[in-house]
Structures are given as C-alpha cells and as structure tokens.
Swiss-Prot record:
It is an enzyme of class 3 (hydrolase). Ca(2+) 2 binds at D321, D323, D325, C327, E332. Ca(2+) 1 binds at D201, D203, D205, Y207, E212. GO terms for biological process: cellular homeostasis; mitochondrial outer membrane permeabilization; mitochondrion organization; mitochondrion transport along microtubule. The chain crosses the membrane at residues 602-622. InterPro entries: EF-hand-dom_pair, EF_Hand_1_Ca_BS, EF_hand_assoc_1, EF_hand_assoc_2, EF_hand_dom, Miro, Miro-EF-hand_domain, MIRO_dom. Residues 3-170, 420-625 form the Miro domain. The keyword Nucleotide-binding applies. Its EC number is 3.6.5.-. This is Mitochondrial Rho GTPase 1. Its main location: mitochondrion.
Length: 625
C-alpha cells in the first residue's frame, strides 16, 4: 500500500468480470463525464476529503484478475473497507459470476463470516436490460451485501452515488447494527443503545420525557425537536411498538424500536451519530481514546477527582438512590453500574468502604470509592466514568470527549514541602506489621466496623480501607493500605514505599512483634521524609518485653519518632478515632515531623486548630504552618 493510501479513511476495491466497465466507472467519476478511451486498468486513485459528501479521504483500487496473481488479489481485498462487485446488466453471465466467483473469493480472503460490506454495482444500465429478478435472491442469500445500485458510466447515471454508498457502507455500516436474518437489532447494538438510554434518563424513572428527549436531540444533533416533531416520534413508535410509549414518554423498548426504524429506512447515519456521540467505534466498543485518554503524571504528583468529577459521581448517587435514604442498596448499586462491562463494587472490595449496618454503601463510602480508585488505579476510574457517561456533551457535535476533565493532577510533593502546605484531598497511609498484629481490626475501624464485623471477614479481602477524616476543620480522605509481607526481609515495591505516612503496628503481648516493625522501618523509611508512627495494639493484654535492642519507646526516641500510640478497645470500630486524625495530620503536614516527635502523640492528636491554641505543640504547629 502506498504512503498516500495509508492516509485514506475509506478504501474501496472494485472487482468483477472483464468488460463490465470497472475502469470506465472510475474515469467517469474523476472526469465527471463519459471518457471514450480508458486504460485497461487504473492505478490507485486517492480522492481528497473536501470533495466527498462525508468529508472522508477515499482510495479506489481497480483490480484486474488477468493482470495480477491470485495471492496479490486476495491481499488487496483484505485491505479493503468496502468491496464493489461490478457486473453488466446486459450480460447475465457476469451476474452468475457474482455467486460463483466473486463472493466466494471475498469469503476466501476474509473468512466465511466477515463484516466487510459488499455493494453490487450493475453497470451499463443505460438500456432496457433488467436483472432485478436475479439480483434480489443474491442479496437475500448473502448478508454481507449491503445494497445494489444500477448505473451507467456512459450516461453518468448513479456514478457518484455508487461511491457515496460505498463510503456510507464503511462509515455507517449496517451489519454491526442489524441482523438481516432476524430483522432485529444485533445484541451489540441493543447493549450500546441501552447504555445510551440509561445515561439520558436523567431522573432514572425508566422513561425519556419530552425534556430528556430534547436534551438527547440537542446533544447528538445540535438542534432541538419541535413539539410537533416530538409527537410525531412518539406516534411512530406507538404505531409499531405498543410498549414503546407510556405516560407520554418514550420507554426503553420504544427507544430501541425507534433506532430499528431508522436502520430499516436506510438512515443508519442517525443511529451511528448517536452511538459515536457516546464514544462507540464501528466495532460497537468504546474507543480506546474515549476510555483511556493520554495523561502524563509527573513524579511526586498524584491524581484526584476534579470538581467536575466530584459533581458527576455525586449526581449519579442522587440519581440511583431511589428511596433517598443516603445509601445504595445492592439493587441500586447494581443499577448504577449496569452500563459497565464488569462488576465494579463487589462483596470483597466493599470492605474497603463505609457501609450501613445492612452492608449497604453509604454516600460517604461511595465518594470514598471514587477517591481511592482515582489515586491508586486511574485507568479504572477513566474507564468506569466513560461507561457511566462522562463527559458526553462536552466536546462538540458528533464526538465523545474524554475523561480528563474528571481528574486533577496534584502539585509535586516536594513543592508542597517547600510551601508548607498542600491542596491535596487524598492521602495514603501504609500499614505495616507482623502477622496477628491487629492490622485488619485497625484498618476496618476506619470504615466503622467493630470486632463482630471483622470476625465475618474472610482471609481474602481488600488490602485497602478509605474514609473521610477531619484535619484542621477540613475534610480529607485517608487511605489505609496494608503491606502484605510475611517477613521484614520481603521487598517492598516503589508504590508501597511512596506513601504519605506509615503506621507500624505491633502487638504488645507478642515479644517478636515490634522487631518486625523496627526492621522494616530501618530498611525502608529511616532517613526518608515520610512521617512514621508506631502503634501499639492489644493494649488490654499483659505487656511483654520486646525482643529488640531497645524498648519501643527508646527506639522512637533514638530515631526521633513520635511516642508509640496505643490502639485500645475503645478505638475499635471508631472511624473518628483521634489516631486516624493524627495519621491524616502527619500526612497533610509532613514538614512538622519534628513537632510530632517533640510532643506527646496523644496530646498532639487532641490539638484543635483555631484562633487560640495552648501548649507548646500548638505554638510549634502554628509557627510551621
């Protein structure tokens, strides 16, 4: 294929018996008149986009069986977007050749079940000859045949229409949308249009009201429908689909039927305009650019929901919280994410989030989910937001945008340290500890779950827990991430060592528990700028001496760490525990590490930032903010 041809949006290949007028058709198209002297075969022709009705660059290839070997012919056919099989209406043998030679050759090239459209072109129709009785059975028996056009290169009859239909067959193909055998929408098309309907059903009542229909019309086509046009649409649907209209609104069945009507009436471009507005490619899959927009995240930066992203996901919650109880029941949650290809929030990963006593996702837990995913798995956030309909309508007519507007890239941490402040909302805390140190109980407490809840959690559960905490009268998200290491010699990944704060948990009743924490700290976090704190668990039990060079308190003094914090029974299940507030404060203000060291951790956790702050710790914090 030539370099110029690789730029073509549509590649049309003409095949057919010798003498059918393939070359004459191309010459008549180029010259806009009949040409008496034509070559045996033309080289490839490239037609610029600005002279085509659909504004697409088009390549036309004139194949000659006699002049080329079969392998080359097959190779050329395989590169085609659409194939025109040319026959002569004055020669019935060329009609027979469609079934005996050309369609089999096309299937040999693409495989028995292919989706490359085929157009039958009956040339030399300037006389009285008519082959309709033979052509119609061919079209009915071969679903890849999109249409048949009779034309005349001599009189210019339908010459430009042939190539227009060929372009349309590629740009607005029928087969992905319509099953010619069942005369119904394909499963892929139904699934895509159901997603479109659910996104446009703003109030989630199962209907498209006149307002929602008009919003849909303006979004996809740039102009509103008149009241008369709206009534005509609903009347046409009611006539053919009794269940399509109710309460003077369009139901899902009616919406699907409306697009079936468009396709059956040859208005495929209408349905394709809708589908492409909502991100679909010809394969009826969402485009990669739509799902995964390119983004560069500098080292030291993180990603969070932007105000637009927060507004979008918050509105989704309101839309699908049908009983307005501030929670999403399993059915409401399933309904919200029904347009996504795979389950989003499962029984396992819901343990990372706040739920009510029935295990239903609260609004707080729902928003925490999006903040967690955006921080640790941005690709997943992009994908899910795209399926859910963000940012349809933001990028102009005929195209879906991308999800970049849904997120913001935070400032580099190094600059935050230099400026003694940050505008970040989400912070990650690494939770490190030996087996049975109480990590699961500690982490689940952030989600408000007590011992009885933890007892029901299986061994395989999410290594994350996230919730909102208050820091200096601001709402932040603290994401706890458990480090799954069996021994302190196990290596930590770069993602694990780049946390905002680290909590080392040790069991005061296990003499070997602290050694695990001390070893990991010295190996990975000593002399780094990451704030760290030791947390003593199971403090109601009898404390034993730890098998380490020095006791935990002395270890913290030597390494200028805050004194160990006690995680007691009273903290279990308390998402508002001062311990979580202190971890968040250390993450938000890492430049205050020495303040945390100089002062008692329990005192510091109780500090209230306001107009008047007492004690030395308050003075030091104010001085360094």
């Amino acid at each position: 294929m030539s370099d110029d041809e690789t730029l073509a949006d549509v590649r049309i290949v003409l095949i057919g018996d010798e003498g059918c007028g393939k070359t004459s058709l191309v010459m008549s198209l180029l010259e806009d008149e009949w040409v008496d002297a034509v070559p045996r075969r033309l080289d490839r022709v490239l037609i610029p986009a600005d002279v085509t009705p659909e504004n697409v660059t088009t390549s036309i290839v004139d194949l000659s069986i006699k002049e080329e070997d079969e392998n080359w012919i097959v190779s050329e056919i395989r590169q085609a977007n659409v194939i025109c099989v040319v026959y002569s209406v004055t020669d019935e043998s060329t009609v027979d050749g469609i079934q005996t030679k050309w369609l089999p050759l096309i299937r040999q090239s693409f495989g028995e079940y292919h989706e490359t459209p085929v157009i039958l072109v009956g040339n030399k129709s300037d006389g009285t000859a008519n082959n309709t009785d033979k052509i119609l059975p061919i079209m009915e028996a071969n679903t890849e045949v999109e249409t048949c056009v009779e034309c005349s290169a001599r009189t210019m009859k339908n010459v430009s229409e042939i190539f227009y239909y060929a372009q349309k067959a590629v740009i607005y193909p029928t087969r992905p949308l319509y099953d010619a055998d069942t005369k119904q929408l394909t499963d892929r098309a139904r699934k895509a249009l159901i997603r479109v309907f659910k996104i446009c059903d703003r109030d989630n009542d199962g209907y498209l009201s006149d307002t929602e229909l008009n919003d849909f019309q303006k979004l996809c086509f740039g102009i509103p429908l008149t009241s008369t046009a709206l009534e005509d649409v609903k009347r046409a649907v009611s006539d053919g689909c009794p269940d399509g209209v109710a309460n003077d609104s369009l139901m899902l069945a009616g919406f699907l039927y409306l697009h079936l009507l468009f396709i059956e009436r040859g208005r495929h471009e209408t349905t394709w305009a809708v589908l492409r507005k909502f991100g679909y490619e010809t394969s009826l899959k969402l485009s990669e650019d739509y799902l995964y927009p390119r983004i560069t995240i500098p080292v030291g930066c993180s990603t969070e929901l932007s105000p637009e992203g927060v507004q979008f996901v918050s509105a989704l919650f309101e839309k699908y919280d049908e009983d307005k109880d501030g929670c999403l029941s399993p059915s409401e949650l399933q309904n919200l994410f029904s347009v996504c290809p795979v389950p989003v929030i499962t029984k396992d990963n819901i343990l990372a989030l706040e739920t009510n006593q029935r295990g239903w996702l609260t609004y707080n837990g729902y928003m925490a989910y999006w903040n967690m995913t955006t921080l640790i798995n941005l690709t997943q956030t992009f994908e899910q937001l795209a399926y859910l309909g963000f940012p349809v309508g933001r990028s102009g007519p005929g195209r879906a945008g991308n999800t970049l507007d849904s997120i913001r890239v935070t400032r580099e941490r190094k600059k935050d340290l230099e400026n003694h402040g940050t505008d970040r909302k989400v912070f990650q805390c690494l939770v490190v500890g030996a087996k049975d140190a109480g990590k699961t109980v500690f982490m689940q407490s952030l989600a408000g779950r007590g011992m009885a809840d933890v007892a029901q959690i299986g061994r395989r559960h999410s290594p994350f827990v996230i919730n909102r905490v208050r820091v200096k009268e601001e709402s932040k998200y603290l994401l706890l991430r458990e480090v799954d290491v069996l021994s302190p010699q196990d290596a930590l990944g770069s993602g694990e060592t780049s946390a905002d704060v680290v909590a080392f948990l040790y069991d005061i009743s296990n003499p070997d528990s602290f050694a695990f924490c001390a070893t990991v700290y010295q190996k990975y976090f000593y002399r780094t700028k990451t704030p760290c704190v030791m947390i003593a668990t199971k403090v109601e039990r009898e404390e034993v001496d730890q098998r380490w060079e020095v006791p935990p308190e002395e270890f913290c003094r030597q390494f200028e760490l805050p004194k160990p914090i006690k995680f007691s029974t009273g903290n279990i299940g308390q998402s508002s525990s001062p311990i979580f507030e202190q971890l968040a404060m250390m993450a938000v203000y890492p430049h205050l590490r020495r303040v945390f060291y100089l002062n008692d951790s329990n005192l510091l956790s109780k500090i209230t930032f306001g107009a008047a702050i007492v004690a030395l710790a308050g003075f030091l914090v104010l001085k360094n903010l």
